[in-house]
Amino acid sequence: MKVTFQVPSITCNHCVDKIEKFVGEIEGVSFIDASVEKKSVVVEFDTPATQDLIKEALLDAGQEVV
């Protein structure tokens, strides 16, 4: 599954690195594309990963998800 999350709080490459670290730790995540310019994060994943787990990881990384 491929999902795009709108994350308006992404402001720099440090944010991107932190997002990639937190979301990348979730089993089942196969691709992450966090964009400062688009203020979005595209994630491809399979079970056991879920949208809720990814959203929680984004929040744990200090980001706001809308």
Curated annotation (Swiss-Prot):
It holds the Pfam family HMA. GO terms for molecular function: copper ion binding. The keyword Nucleotide-binding does not apply. SUPFAM superfamilies: HMA, heavy metal-associated domain. InterPro entries: Cu-bd, Heavy-metal-associated_CS, HMA_Cu_ion-bd, HMA_dom, HMA_dom_sf. Cu cation binds at residues 12, 15. It comes from the Bacteria. GO terms for biological process: copper ion transport. Keywords: Copper, Metal-binding. Residues 1-66 form the HMA domain. Part of a cation-transporting system which is associated with copper export out of the H.pylori cells. NCBIfam families: chaper_CopP (NF033781), copper ion binding protein (TIGR00003). This is COP-associated protein. It comes from Helicobacter pylori (strain J99 / ATCC 700824). The gene is copP.
